[in-house]
Amino acid sequence: DQIGKAEALWRSADMYLNTQVAEVWERTCCSGICSMDNRIMLRLAGTHTIHQAKAVTDIVYDLCSTDSIFQHNDIQRRFQDIHVIAQHMQGIPEIYSIVGRHFLGLPVNSHLV
């Protein structure tokens, strides 16, 4: 059941990200500008996808048990990489706060958008 859960998490995040990128691309090509709404939607989709990828990697890492800790195991490198990416500015929890402020009509003064 964990592999099925991981697959569902990944596929839904991947579809969400690709849908948002396509929609923003189309709107930007039509208008010639990437609006704040578009930038917010891209940030949200990107951050969400990072955290879902981290959750998927954690599931697989746990399933591999102690084999996961060895450098010759590919999952170890992927585990390390996704945890680093989640700490990058694109993956930080503050993104959700910024998006929430935007959706509530509150000012967003951030270089992260």
Which ranges hold each PLM region?
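Charged, glycine-rich active-site and insertion segments that engage polyanionic ligands
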Residues: D37-S68
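Charge-rich, acidic-biased intrinsically disordered regions
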Residues: E26-R43, S68-V84
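Catalytic cores of transferase enzymes with a strong primary signal for eukaryotic protein kinases
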Residues: G4, N18, S35, D62, ...
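Generic structural signal for well-ordered, non-transmembrane alpha-helical segments
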Residues: G4-R11, R43, T47-K54, Q80-H83, ...
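Extended amphipathic alpha-helical segments enriched in small hydrophobics
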Residues: D1-E26
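Glycine-rich phosphate/cofactor-binding loops in nucleotide/flavin-utilizing enzymes
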Residues: T66-V113
